[in-house]
């Protein structure tokens, strides 16, 4: 018999390392030949889209096209440490460090332009589209390329640092802010349970994710799709068989992960509520997108068959066994 169930899962997630561990990101910005700008951070791009979003943050702060930004990362010798690509912290922490570095860089450009343009001060100077100009007299201007040629090449740079703010928990009240910021989400699924075979099929899913501000909506949707697929594997497929510290099912023929046939097109709702301390309001959503999916699936299974599953993954064998035990208990009660 096939039964339909619906379930909802909710979560909130504190980004960053949290209390008790220094959470620091640093960035360097440098003027390059041809008027391009290099952004240097020791943060890792693992496919989550950090390189794209961090480039966009730099381009927005410098008011220049993203095509003119050269993003350099993952070189621990020549660039400042931006911390790990973990705890959903790169967009918020390193994004803030880049914003600060770009603001310092803008001020440095204004000072240099003031000297070359023989101006009294930097007041009225604007930095946009690869040039520095006087707002009320635009003829007084200097392009990034011209400034690079006029200066000692390679020495026009600035750095920025961001340290995440947290509040230690009060011992008596338990109140505090061990992480900041927090992100929130919700997931709802409709699924079908085959009570004979134990197979579970997700029929429909809706996912709502708070992102602060979606700097790159396509990447946000990609994170939501990826988090859902990863959680699907965690809940229904990936059964790690360990014995004496050794993985027994170390082949994909034995350790199953979701394929394109197992996933589905989910309805994605991006919730924007800009975070005041974040770079242009954006928050990280790496890990959070996975968290509510499991509870939603487990609640939907319970809704379908009336059995609470407390062991993951919910393999067909475990599900059939749980159903049989539940039926046996009902029979004994009668």
Model-flagged regions — what are they?
Residues 1-334:
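Cofactor-binding beta-sheet edge motifs in enzyme active sites
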């Amino acid at each position: 018999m096939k039964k339909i169930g619906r379930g909802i899962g909710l979560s909130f997630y504190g980004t960053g390392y949290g209390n008790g561990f220094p959470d620091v990101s640093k960035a360097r910005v440098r003027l390059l030949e041809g008027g391009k700008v290099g952004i240097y951070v020791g943060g890792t791009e693992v496919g989550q889209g950090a390189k794209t979003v961090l480039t966009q943050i730099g381009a927005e702060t410098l008011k220049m096209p993203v095509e003119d930004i050269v993003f350099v990362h993952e070189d621990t010798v020549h660039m400042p440490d931006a911390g790990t690509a973990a705890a959903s912290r790169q967009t918020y922490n390193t994004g803030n460090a880049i914003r600060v570095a770009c603001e310092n860089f803008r001020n440095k450009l204004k000072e240099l332009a003031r000297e070359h343009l023989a101006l009294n001060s930097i007041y009225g100077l604007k930095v946009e589209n690869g040039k520095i100009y006087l707002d009320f007299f635009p003829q007084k201007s200097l392009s990034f390329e011209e400034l690079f040629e006029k200066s000692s090449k390679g020495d026009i740079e600035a750095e920025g640092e961001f340290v995440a703010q947290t509040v230690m928990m009060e011992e008596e009240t338990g109140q505090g802010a061990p992480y900041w910021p927090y992100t929130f989400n919700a997931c709802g699924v409709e699924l079908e349970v085959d009570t004979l075979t134990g197979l579970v099929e997700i029929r429909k899913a809706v996912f709502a994710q708070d992102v602060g501000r979606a700097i790159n909506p396509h990447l946000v949707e990609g994170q939501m799709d990826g988090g859902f697929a990863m959680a699907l594997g965690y809940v229904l497929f990936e059964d790690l068989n360990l014995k004496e510290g050794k993985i027994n099912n170390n082949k994909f023929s034995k350790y199953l992960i979701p394929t394109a046939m197992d996933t589905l097109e989910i309805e994605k709702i991006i919730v924007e509520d800009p975070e005041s301390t974040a770079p242009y309001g954006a928050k990280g959503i790496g890990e959070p997108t996975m968290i509510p999916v499991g509870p939603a699936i487990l609640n939907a299974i319970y809704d379908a068959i009336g059995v609470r599953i407390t062991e993951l993954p919910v393999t067909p064998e475990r599900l059939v066994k749980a159903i049989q035990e539940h039926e046996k208990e009902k029979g004994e009660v009668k």
